[in-house]
């Protein structure tokens, strides 16, 4: 059934704010596990290990060409797309959002006849930050504006 399909891509998009928080916690944990010399390099992991969540987001903003448009750059490409759902419809076989994997699994099954099994894995247990302070949320929202637009557009489209 998949042989005749021209679209080869599938994607599941995560809430950008949750993704930043998860990335911060994961990077912070990774930094704390590193040895002395490797802690000296000024990287994203260094920023997570030494700064608050808001400081970490400031570091990401300062290095926007590398860390900006984190989701949309991989899903939509190098240029801004005004209608991300239309782009996904034209270029992706199936798409969804992590928080509604049930809808993605159903859509993929309807289109392919293949059943996917949902699994929860890869969770950072030792989270330094569980709740996002309002000031950090504002900073993340500004930094992830395009990713948030993509996520909200996709979520709205799949929940119709």
Show the residue positions of the predicted features.
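PAPS-dependent sulfotransferase catalytic domain
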Residues: 1-13, 17-118
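PAPS-dependent sulfotransferase catalytic core
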Residues: 100, 116-160
């Amino acid at each position: 059934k998949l042989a005749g399909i021209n679209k080869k891509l599938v994607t599941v998009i995560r809430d950008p704010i949750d993704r930043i928080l998860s990335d911060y916690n994961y990077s912070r944990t990774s930094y704390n596990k590193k040895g002395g010399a490797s802690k000296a390099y000024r990287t994203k992991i260094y920023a997570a290990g030494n700064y608050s969540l808001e400081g970490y987001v400031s570091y990401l903003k300062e290095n926007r060409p590398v860390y900006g448009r984190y989701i949309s750059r991989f899903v939509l490409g190098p240029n801004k797309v005004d209608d991300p759902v239309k782009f996904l419809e034209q270029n992706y076989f199936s798409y969804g959002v992590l928080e509604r994997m049930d809808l993605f699994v159903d859509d993929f099954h309807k289109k392919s006849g293949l059943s996917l099994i949902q699994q929860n894995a890869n969770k950072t247990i030792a989270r330094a930050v569980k709740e996002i302070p309002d000031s950090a949320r504002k900073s993340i929202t500004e930094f992830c504006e395009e990713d948030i637009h993509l996520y909200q557009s996709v979520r709205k489209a799949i929940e119709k």
